[in-house]
Design a protein with these regions (language model features):
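Gram-negative outer-membrane beta-barrel transporters
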Residues: 4-99, 138-141, 165
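Transmembrane beta-barrel architecture of outer membranes
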Residues: 29, 69-75, 110-114, 149, ...
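Short, well-ordered amphipathic alpha-helices
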Residues: 33-38, 114-120
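A structural signal for short secondary-structure junctions
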Residues: 81, 108-111, 123-126
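Short structured motifs
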Residues: 100-101, 148
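Short, surface-exposed loop/helix-turn segments at secondary-structure junctions
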Residues: 101-107
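C-terminal beta-signal and adjacent terminal beta-strands/loops
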Residues: 119-168
Length: 168
């Protein structure tokens, strides 16, 4: 069969991007999530301890696993409001995801440690929040199993910064 430039085709130019078509299929999901915590009041402020966990399993009714399913996660956090400082320390353990669909690769788990400390200053009728933060303090190479581009674009490495927020 001959092809001519002036003939119309089913194909369209997508600007070099991959065209993907997704179809829905029946699936069965099971899982759970929970969170427990407690707070303590002190003369200088308050402290809250929290633990949460979530896990999901799913398979297509035709047999294989549902793709890009989030792995189990455990999160521990400490929130405090002490002597005018609001502090949050959180640690999250994301498990390996080895229960994968036929078309995907397993993803390694990772540990994520984040910290933020905020102080609010009154400026007349306005307020200024100054936050010092650290994200991924362990500098882990972390990939989200749910991402289509997990291999090309891991989560950011260690990130330290200062954030200012001014309220009129």
């Amino acid at each position: 069969e001959e092809e001519h430039e002036d003939e119309e085709h089913e194909e369209h130019d997508h600007g070099g991007l991959i065209l993907a078509e997704y179809e829905q299929e029946d699936a069965s999901f099971s899982g759970y999530e929970f969170e427990i915590g407690t707070s303590f009041d002190f003369d200088m402020g308050q402290l809250t301890l929290t633990y949460s966990r979530d896990q999901t399993n799913a398979s297509l009714d035709s047999g294989p696993r549902v793709p890009r399913l989030a792995p189990a996660r455990d999160t521990f956090s400490v929130d405090g409001s002490i002597s005018g400082f609001d502090t949050r320390l959180s640690y999250q353990r994301v498990s390996d995801q080895s229960k994968v669909a036929p078309s995907e690769e397993p993803t390694d788990g990772y540990d994520m440690l984040n910290l933020s400390i905020t102080r609010t200053f009154a400026l007349g009728a306005s307020e200024l929040d100054v936050t010092v933060f650290g994200r991924n303090l362990l500098d882990e190479v972390a990939r989200r199993h749910t991402s289509y581009v997990k291999e090309e674009a891991p989560l950011p490495g260690r990130n330290l910064g200062v954030k200012l927020y001014y309220r009129l």
